[in-house]
Amino acid sequence: MPQTITTGYKALVEAAEKEIETIPTAEAIKLAGRDDTVLVDIRDIRELERDGKVPGAFHCPRGMLEFWIDPNGSYFKPVFGEDKKFVFFCAGGLRSALAAQTAKRMGLKPVAHIAGGFGGWKKAGGPTEPGTK
């Protein structure tokens, strides 16, 4: 019997966006380089290599997020223990909404995500570094 998916990704993202702050791209660009903010790039490493990256953003692959946030886990990254605002982004703003929701539910705060993701960032003229491939 085929699987019956009861909740699609669009509904999940919509629900996440009701729980978290969504920052417009122009506002997010102003946060770059601030001492009180960490921009968290959750894209896959291949996306960074292909499309480039935001200078100074911390790269945390989406698949490792929960493990890197948990201070009791062996994969914990100290950046997630800092008293800062964590602003997540992906390529288009869908995965980052889910990531910010998960981070918030784990107790990380404050968190937000960038509307439009890296694509919106580039379109708005935000600073970028080229990919390596």
Task: Report residues per predicted region.
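Short, surface-exposed ligand- or partner-binding patches at beta-edge/loop junctions that are enriched
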Residues: 89
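Active-site flanking residues adjacent to catalytic metal/cofactor-binding acidic residues
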Residues: 40
